[in-house]
Regions:
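Amphipathic, heptad-repeat alpha-helical segments
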Residues: 21-66
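Long, amphipathic alpha-helical segments that form or neighbor coiled-coils/leucine zippers used
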Residues: 69-95
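C-terminal motif of bacterial Sec signal peptides marking the signal peptidase cleavage site
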Residues: 16-19
Length: 95
């Protein structure tokens, strides 16, 4: 029996560490998306050339932030943060 308890404790610890890694990655993704969005929303050339892409970047970022704060998984947060970054990049390319 002690072997099964030890195995269970080890598996539980691994799952907790994986969850921490996912959370850290989602926080990093959010921070990068926020930085990219801040740059494009402050650039008048980008706002003039690609307003819809800037709006989409902001909407995707807002969704990622909502998901991170209460009910989304880390993969959901990472996905919407990625979309926000891509829309920011697309907007910048149009300027």
């Amino acid at each position: 029996m002690p072997g099964k308890a030890t195995l269970f404790a080890t598996l539980l610890a691994c799952a907790a560490l994986a969850g921490c890694a996912d959370h850290k990655l989602s926080e990093q993704s959010l921070a990068k998306a926020q930085s990219e969005f801040d740059q494009v929303k402050e650039d008048s050339d980008v706002l003039r050339a690609a307003p819809k892409d800037v709006i989409r970047a902001g909407e995707s970022l807002a969704r990622a932030e909502r998901l991170s704060s209460y009910w989304g998984s880390s993969s959901d947060v990472i996905q919407y943060a990625y979309l926000s970054q891509r829309y920011s990049e697309i907007a910048r390319q149009h300027a």
